[in-house]
């Protein structure tokens, strides 16, 4: 038997079938490094339109987790796709370095009592060490960026830039000192930002407390009575007994109806709609003897249960009747609403009682409870209320309560003297920061769109921003306050610039070492140099000022507004929020044109990642076992607008999809063996019809892919690429062309036409996947034929794809119909194989009984229809002639009849044909193969 293998164009490539990503990816990283890819991208980007994605800095503490990986991969997909779209898209990674978590870590290691300068030195060293670890992990994910020059908020230039940003806000009239309740953590010993507060369930003491009336005549008059016949009390309900020693007022809603209830022993004032539930709670019977609106109770005084002072009634719209009594006890030092209400009624700061110290302990001279920690004092306060006859009910309730994000301990609101950025303070230009920020939101594009309403609601309802902290490791607030008046030095902005210049040279330590006399001269004795530091959200929130336009070597190129900020959805109250406020204050607009948010990672059951649940998947595990490209493919395939489910099983599905894409690329490469595009590319107008369709289909797909990348719908890119590889290529085109590719002459037009199409598709495909499968695309790039530059990323979207001309004989609708017919035939062939009626498809001869229009369409392929259906023979007959044994197909107007061929198998092309054995010199092969070996070669037009 003759071996015809040498006469076939069998596929061949050195591109490995097995990816081996954990081993191969580090080699590709080394290659990118050796060719200085990032710098080359900046060089070729000169003169291109810019696209700036400004990096929200992760905190420089601990290993990266899967959420970090998701964030950086999405950013990288955007930067890479914008680069391929012809933009200059630099990416400067950053780190957030100051703040309590690092200071806490250093204190845990070295103790709390070390000198402040030593603490700062150790914090700086610790942050630098953490950055190196995180940086290595981000690079391993394939994230392309300026890793040699990242920005760090602890860089001296950035610390100085932050002071300059603060000076701009002082100059604009937005910064003031005030006494206000702020979120306070006893363990931190400092105020916390809103973004540092999380809510957990907490068990609390809920108490109903009676305040006896002092102005009995006024209370009687309010209820339309001549006098009160017995002891009368107003009742409050609270879950914070520890605030009772700080009570200074009582709040009622001006429009609610309040009832005077006779319970026998005493009269109680309660909101009318809560009377029944309150009496039931107290185990009392009673009847309403009078009613009045809340506004009638204004300024009537009641006695504190155990201190010799009075609590007047103030009107407040925030009072609700969802629980409690409809009356709120007001401790202005420990509640935002309470504080506002008391200030509205003229209470001076000096009159506000604040018996709780920064460590949560009452001042020592507080009667009854001095020196006690507030949480431990609760039982004693309840006991005291019972002792004086003021306690009507005590029970324990479970409710959601604010906790420190770091220590997981309960927080309180605590009025302290702090520095604030005023939301409603009218700036020098007559506008408020709140108005500026809300206007800026309207000018910002949000992905997903619901982010706009969310951020708008947060800005509309937020209090003034407390920017001061009482910590060591942070950028100083370099203010000098007059010792008598408490006012800022009149040259504050000028002095801040002088401090910034010193910090630029010596870091934040320059402020702690500074002698006030160096700047103030003889005035120094009159001024106090403050020691507060800035909220870390001010650090990251001003990077648009001191990184995008300042400290970074690329800063001047980036300008005042980034095209995009991209972080997790929690950053609406974090980095997006603080950046918006500082941008609106300094520049009058947001520092970003667009905001993109992604959801959090959960396991396959929708549960939060947690060590206790054992469902945590570290990105390092994925890169070590499966490769970064598998993680990147999973990110691309997942709709990030909601929760992002990840598990080993889900990642395995991504690995399976990866293999299908890789195998498609390998098929393309192996069939381009020996193809030199400079010599062998067939002209477009000479290409076989099916090849022209394949190129046209790739062009249409590329347009859809470009649109999906532009709108950040990476899951659409994934689906389109995967479906193209599996269905249109793997399930249709590549299957059909194998015969032509392998059996026609090596340099024949049918084969070169096919290779031309494969080449165009490969050139396009490698670019489509480059933003997602960064490593694999680079690997494919090295195996593609023809002259090319060093990296796929040094190119733009492929421009060699040609559209089918209008009126082309076999256009898109034609091939869509052919695919449907092929799917119907494949289904019946599979049935026949399963029934053992045929072996392979080439043992089959098919008759298509088709209605007239379909028959006419299929007939256009002539004898080449069999190559499309991959059977040895195809006949077309009228649908009306279909015999009883013909099988219905899912395609209307088509029936099928498959029969096993009686002809011999060609030993070269494996088709079963009547002329096999008719050629004396080649008795084992068909006439077509003889022509392809010895003659001019077969002619193909369509397939």
Curated annotation (Swiss-Prot):
It catalyses: tRNA(Ile) + L-isoleucine + ATP = L-isoleucyl-tRNA(Ile) + AMP + diphosphate. One of its GO terms (cellular component) is cytosol. ATP binds at residue 611. L-isoleucyl-5'-AMP binds at residue 567. It is found in: Cytoplasm. Belongs to the class-I aminoacyl-tRNA synthetase family. IleS type 1 subfamily. One of its GO terms (biological process) is isoleucyl-tRNA aminoacylation. Coiled coil: none annotated. Its main location: cytoplasm. One of its GO terms (molecular function) is ATP binding. Its EC number is 6.1.1.5. Monomer. IleRS has two distinct active sites: one for aminoacylation and one for editing. The misactivated valine is translocated from the active site to the editing site, which sterically excludes the correctly activated isoleucine. The single editing site contains two valyl binding pockets, one specific for each substrate (Val-AMP or Val-tRNA(Ile)). A motif ('KMSKS' region) lies at residues 608-612. This is Isoleucine--tRNA ligase. Pfam families: Anticodon_1, tRNA-synt_1, zf-FPG_IleRS. InterPro entries: aa-tRNA-synth_I_CS (IPR001412), aa-tRNA-synth_Ia (IPR002300), Anticodon_Ile_BEm (IPR033708), Ile-tRNA-ligase (IPR002301), Ile-tRNA-ligase_type1 (IPR023585), Ile-tRNA_ligase (IPR050081), M/V/L/I-tRNA-synth_anticd-bd (IPR013155), Rossmann-like_a/b/a_fold (IPR014729). A motif ('HIGH' region) lies at residues 58-68. Catalyzes the attachment of isoleucine to tRNA(Ile). As IleRS can inadvertently accommodate and process structurally similar amino acids such as valine, to avoid such errors it has two additional distinct tRNA(Ile)-dependent editing activities. One activity is designated as 'pretransfer' editing and involves the hydrolysis of activated Val-AMP. The other activity is designated 'posttransfer' editing and involves deacylation of mischarged Val-tRNA(Ile). It comes from Stutzerimonas stutzeri (strain A1501) (Pseudomonas stutzeri). The keyword Cytoplasm applies. Zn(2+) binds at residues 906, 909, 926, 929. SUPFAM superfamilies: Anticodon-binding domain of a subclass of class I aminoacyl-tRNA synthetases, Nucleotidylyl transferase, ValRS/IleRS/LeuRS editing domain. Keywords: Aminoacyl-tRNA synthetase, ATP-binding, Cytoplasm, Ligase, Metal-binding, Nucleotide-binding, Protein biosynthesis, Zinc. Its cofactor is Zn(2+). Binds 1 zinc ion per subunit.
């Amino acid at each position: 038997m003759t071996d015809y293998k040498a006469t076939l164009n069998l596929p061949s490539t050195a591109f490995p079938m097995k990816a081996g990503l954990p081993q191969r990816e580090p080699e590709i990283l080394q290659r990118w490094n050796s060719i200085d890819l990032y710098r080359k991208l900046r060089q070729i980007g000169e003169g291109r339109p810019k696209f700036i994605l400004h990096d929200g800095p992760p905190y420089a503490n601990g290993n990266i987790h899967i959420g970090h990986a998701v964030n950086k991969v999405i950013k990288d997909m955007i930067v890479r796709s914008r680069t391929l779209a012809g933009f200059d898209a630099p990416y400067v990674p950053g780190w957030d370095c100051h703040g309590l978590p690092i200071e806490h870590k250093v204190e845990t290691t070295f103790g709390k009592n070390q000198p402040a300068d030593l603490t700062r030195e150790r914090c700086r060293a610790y942050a630098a060490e953490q950055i190196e670890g995180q940086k290595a992990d981000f690079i391993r994910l394939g994230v392309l960026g300026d890793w040699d020059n990242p920005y760090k908020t602890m860089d001296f230039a950035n610390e100085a830039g932050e002071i300059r940003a603060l000076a701009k806000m002082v100059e604009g009239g937005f910064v003031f000192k005030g006494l206000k309740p702020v979120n306070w953590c006893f363990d931190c010993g400092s105020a916390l930002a809103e973004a540092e507060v999380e809510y957990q369930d907490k068990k609390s003491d809920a108490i109903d407390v009676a305040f006896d009336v002092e102005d009995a005549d006024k209370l009687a008059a309010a209820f339309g009575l001549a006098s009160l016949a017995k002891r009368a009390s107003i009742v409050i309900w609270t879950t914070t007994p520890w605030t009772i020693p700080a009570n200074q007022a009582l709040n009622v809603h001006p429009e609610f109806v309040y009832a005077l209830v006779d319970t026998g022993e005493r009269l109680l004032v309660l909101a009318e709609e809560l009377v029944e539930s309150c009496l039931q709670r107290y185990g009392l019977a009673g009847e309403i003897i009078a009613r009045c609106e809340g506004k009638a109770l204004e300024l009537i005084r009641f006695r504190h249960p155990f201190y010799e002072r009075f609590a007047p009634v103030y009107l407040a719209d925030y009072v609700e009747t969802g629980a409690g009594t409809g009356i709120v006890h007001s401790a202005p030092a420990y509640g935002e609403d309470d504080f506002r209400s008391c200030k509205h009624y003229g209470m001076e700061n000096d009159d506000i009682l604040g018996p709780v110290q920064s460590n949560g302990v009452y001042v020592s001279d507080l009667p009854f409870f001095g020196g006690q920690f507030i949480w431990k004092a609760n039982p004693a306060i309840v006991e005291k209320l019972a002792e004086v006859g003021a306690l009507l009910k005590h029970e324990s309730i479970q409710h959601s309560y604010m906790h420190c994000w770091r220590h997981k301990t309960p927080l309180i609101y605590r009025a302290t003297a702090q520095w604030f950025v005023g939301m409603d303070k009218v700036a020098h230009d007559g506008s408020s920061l709140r108005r500026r920020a809300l206007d800026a939101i309207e000018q910002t594009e949000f992905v997903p769109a619901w982010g706009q309403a969310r951020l708008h609601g947060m800005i509309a309802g937020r209090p003034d921003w407390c920017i001061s902290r009482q910590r060591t490791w942070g950028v100083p607030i370099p203010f000098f306050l007059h010792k008598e008046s408490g006012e800022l030095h009149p040259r504050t902005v000028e002095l801040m610039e002088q401090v910034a210049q010193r910090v630029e040279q010596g870091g934040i330590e320059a402020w702690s070492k500074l002698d006030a006399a160096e700047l103030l001269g003889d005035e120094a004795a009159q001024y106090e140099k403050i020691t507060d530091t800035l909220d870390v959200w001010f650090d990251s929130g001003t990077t648009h000022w001191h990184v995008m336009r300042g400290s970074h070597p690329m800063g001047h190129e980036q300008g005042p507004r980034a095209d995009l900020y991209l972080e997790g959805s929690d950053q609406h109250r974090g980095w997006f929020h603080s950046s918006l406020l500082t941008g609106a204050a300094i520049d009058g607009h947001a520092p970003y044109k667009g905001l993109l948010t992604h959801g959090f990672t959960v396991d396959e059951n929708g549960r939060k990642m947690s060590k206790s649940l054992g469902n945590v998947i570290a990105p390092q595990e994925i890169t070590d076992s499966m490769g970064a490209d598998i993680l990147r493919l999973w990110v691309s395939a997942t709709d990030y607008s909601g929760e992002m489910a990840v598990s080993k099983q889900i990642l395995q599905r991504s690995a399976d999809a990866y293999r299908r894409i890789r195998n498609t690329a390998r098929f393309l490469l192996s069939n381009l063996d020996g193809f030199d595009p400079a010599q062998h590319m067939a002209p477009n107008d000479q290409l076989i019809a099916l090849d022209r369709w394949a190129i046209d289909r790739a062009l249409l797909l590329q347009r859809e892919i470009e649109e999906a990348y532009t709108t950040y719908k990476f899951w659409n890119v994934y689906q389109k690429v995967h479906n193209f590889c599996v269905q249109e290529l793997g399930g249709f085109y590549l299957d059909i062309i194998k015969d032509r590719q392998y059996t026609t002459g090596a340099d024949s037009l049918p084969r070169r036409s096919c290779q031309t199409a494969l080449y165009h598709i490969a050139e396009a495909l490698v670019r489509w996947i480059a933003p997602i499968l960064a490593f694999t695309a680079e690997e494919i790039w090295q195996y593609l034929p023809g002259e090319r530059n060093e990296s796929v990323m040094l190119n733009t979207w492929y421009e060699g794809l040609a559209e089918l001309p209008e009126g082309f004989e076999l256009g898109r609708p034609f091939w869509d119909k052919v695919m449907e017919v092929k799917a119907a035939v494949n289904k019946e062939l599979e049935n026949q194989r399963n029934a053992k009626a045929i072996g392979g498809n080439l043992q089959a001869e098919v008759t298509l009984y088709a209605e007239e229009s379909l028959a006419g369409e299929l007939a256009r392929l002539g004898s080449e229809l069999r190559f499309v259906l991959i059977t040895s023979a195809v006949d077309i007959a009228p649908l009306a002639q279909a015999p009883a044994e013909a099988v219905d197909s899912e395609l209307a107007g088509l029936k099928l009849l498959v029969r096993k061929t009686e002809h011999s198998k060609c030993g070269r092309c494996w088709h079963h044909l009547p002329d096999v054995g008719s050629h004396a010199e080649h008795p084992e092969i068909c006439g077509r193969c003889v022509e392809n070996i010895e003659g001019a070669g077969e002619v193909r037009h369509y397939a």
